[in-house]
């Protein structure tokens, strides 16, 4: 981002894992803040299930795993995508003064209120966003692109920002529910 003209840059990633946090402190010489999104784990896993079921190129389909239980276990193992995010959330509590926590359900049910809190946290005046039909984000000629992990991982639904029921929540294997169902935010 060194060549970007913006004074404030919001990057998506698990910055508060211990390793990432040390790298930020070492190489990013200015104070920084973290916006931590909290979403119930079963909702996250249901989204993963829907994504890898509907998109054959999704990364959980690249390892010869056959069942939902195998795919979700891979995502949740200590080096898995979701496990890294959970580690980042857990470690963020060591730095509460520099973190702002946003519950996913609050964000999708009242986005303007949550964005106002974020702007207050970063010390910036509020900017009116379009929550009725937001469209894709594009900054400095770059669009959000996560195709490396598979198509459509973070696609936006058309229309107003809202919570959308995901029927895959009911298809999460029982052993996965038993092992991880207690993780809620």
Where are these regions (language model features)?
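PAPS-dependent sulfotransferase catalytic domain
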Residues: 1-2, 42-122
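PAPS-dependent sulfation machinery
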Residues: 1-31, 54-66, 157-158, 166-171, ...
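Short beta-strand segments
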Residues: 9-13, 36-38, 101-103
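Alpha-helical packing segments of well-folded alpha/beta enzyme cores
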Residues: 20, 78-89, 114, 168-180
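Short acidic alpha-helix initiation/capping motifs at coil-to-helix transition points
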Residues: 23, 109-113, 153
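Conserved phosphate-donor/acceptor-positioning beta-strand/loop module used by diverse small-molecule
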Residues: 27-51
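Conserved beta-strand scaffold positions in the cores of enzyme catalytic domains, especially
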Residues: 34, 99-101, 184
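PAPS-dependent sulfotransferases, especially Golgi type II membrane carbohydrate sulfotransferases
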Residues: 49-52, 90-93, 120-185
């Amino acid at each position: 981002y060194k060549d970007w003209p913006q004074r404030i840059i919001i990057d998506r990633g698990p910055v508060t894992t211990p390793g990432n946090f040390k790298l930020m402190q070492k190489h990013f010489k200015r104070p920084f803040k973290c916006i931590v999104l909290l979403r119930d784990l079963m909702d996250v896993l249901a989204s993963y299930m829907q994504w890898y079921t509907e998109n054959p190129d999704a990364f959980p389909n690249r390892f010869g795993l056959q069942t939902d239980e195998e795919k979700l276990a891979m995502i949740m193992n200590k080096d898995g995508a979701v496990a890294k995010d959970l580690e980042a959330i857990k470690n963020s509590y060591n730095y509460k003064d520099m973190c702002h926590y946003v519950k996913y359900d609050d964000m999708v049910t009242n986005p303007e209120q949550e964005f106002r809190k974020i702007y207050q946290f970063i010390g910036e005046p509020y900017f009116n966003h379009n929550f009725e039909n937001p469209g894709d984000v594009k900054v400095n000629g770059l669009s959000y692109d996560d195709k490396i992990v598979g198509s459509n991982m973070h696609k936006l639904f058309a229309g107003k920002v809202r919570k959308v029921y995901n029927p895959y929540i009911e298809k999460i294997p029982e052993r996965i529910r038993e092992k991880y169902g207690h993780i809620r935010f």
